[in-house]
A protein has these predicted regions:
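Post-signal peptide N-terminal segment of mature Sec-exported envelope proteins
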Residues: 26-44
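Extracytoplasmic cysteine-anchoring/structural motifs
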Residues: 17-24, 75-163
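A sequence/structural signal for flexible, mid-protein segments enriched
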Residues: 37, 49, 59, 113-117
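Tryptophan-paired
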Residues: 44-96
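Generic detector of short, locally flexible boundary/turn motifs and exposed helical patches
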Residues: 14-17, 50-54, 121-122
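Sec-dependent bacterial lipoprotein signal peptides
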Residues: 1-17
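Generic detector of solvent-exposed, compositionally biased contiguous segments
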Residues: 3-5, 66-69, 131-135, 139-140
Length: 163
């Protein structure tokens, strides 16, 4: 009888412990890879910054002064059906103006329930992308599924030919 009581107590203690593994950072990001018009990987020679408008009407800087990159990541909103970004490119040289392209990412949002103890995470499915063509020739959706995978490239950006 004593062994049964000890076994029951041990089972209760072990089952009371849980290992809930909530992600520390449950934000997801979209990854952009840069390509030349011939399909080869491109390296950003000029300075790139990206802003996004907020609900209050102000702009928020989400990527600042990237140079020498072949790829970069941007956050994506949780529940908005589309995200608007303003890509600003400052060509090399002291007296050059910023060139601005507007990029709109249309998407569906998929709430993901992981545990009662964790916040709801949102994954996304990219449905389309629109771009003005000031310095970006085109943006192609490479992989529409946005989740915790940080290695997956979601977009391929093809720049207009540069001098």
């Amino acid at each position: 009888m004593r062994r049964i009581i000890i076994a029951a107590i041990a089972a209760a203690v072990v089952s009371a412990c849980s290992s809930i593994d909530c992600p520390v950072q449950n934000s997801v990001y979209t990854n952009y890879a840069l390509y030349k018009s011939d399909g080869g990987v491109d390296t950003l020679r000029d300075t790139l910054s990206v802003l996004t408008p907020t609900a209050s009407g102000r702009d928020t800087l989400v990527f600042n002064r990237g140079v020498g990159l072949t790829s970069f990541s941007l956050p994506i909103s949780y529940v908005n059906p589309c995200d608007t970004f303003f890509f600003g490119l400052k060509p090399q040289g002291d007296n050059t103006e910023w060139i601005i392209d507007r990029v709109v990412v249309n998407k569906t949002n998929e709430p993901r329930f992981e545990s009662v103890d964790c916040q709801v995470a949102y994954f996304h499915n990219i449905t389309s992308v629109e771009v003005t063509h000031n310095f970006i020739d085109s943006i192609v959706i490479n992989n529409p599924k946005v989740d915790y995978d940080t290695e997956r490239k979601h977009f391929r950006i093809y720049f207009s030919p540069r001098q």
